[in-house]
Swiss-Prot record:
Residue ranges of domain Toprim in the record: 80-175
The keyword DNA damage belongs to this UniProt entry's keyword annotation: yes
Family affiliation: Belongs to the RecR family.
Positions of C4-type zinc fingers: 57-72
Record-level GO BP terms: DNA recombination; DNA repair
Protein name: Recombination protein RecR
Keyword Metal-binding in record: yes
Gene3D superfamilies in the cross-refs: 3.30.60.80, 3.40.1360.10, 6.10.250.240, RecR Domain 1
Keywords noted in UniProt: DNA damage, DNA recombination, DNA repair, Metal-binding, Zinc, Zinc-finger
Amino acid sequence: MHYPEPISKLINSFMKLPGIGPKTAQRLAFHTLDMKEDDVVQFAKALVDVKRELTYCSVCGHITENDPCYICEDKQRDRSVICVVEDDKDVIAMEKMREYKGLYHVLHGSISPMDGIGPEDINIPSLIERLKNDEVSELILAMNPNLEGESTAMYISRLVKPIGIKVTRLAQGLSVGGDLEYADEVTLSKAIAGRTEM
């Protein structure tokens, strides 16, 4: 189908988002065309602002407006425990549960040889450096229960064991192949309470 150039560009831009195929991108593009100009300008500004105003915490890797992030700055947190997660949405899911009081480390991905992603491509080197310099007694590996998450957890466990830090994994109850961000608070709460040593 031939569209005017601005619509084609907008459709292609929407298709760069995860889970957005050609039909959904087309629907979003035409919806954008029907929006009031002020709303479109606000939407475009929000997209630009999220890239310009947010950064990653230099300590844990979580998205933040200020560096270090509010979690790393919170003196009430248990600094002896770090929960390692794959991405920022996992931190948000864990925080919703309101039971975990330790710190986080965001990997921004998982090891996936099929996709050409190795340990050096995600935030593992900074985790190891952090563990050597901080007073951490437990590392909770909260990767997603899928092949990539399990591979990443095993890799980190092998790296951390020689440092002498207790390494635990969330209890199962999270569905295999599922994503942490979609788990409800009760399931997450039980998984953190029943974590097992690796």
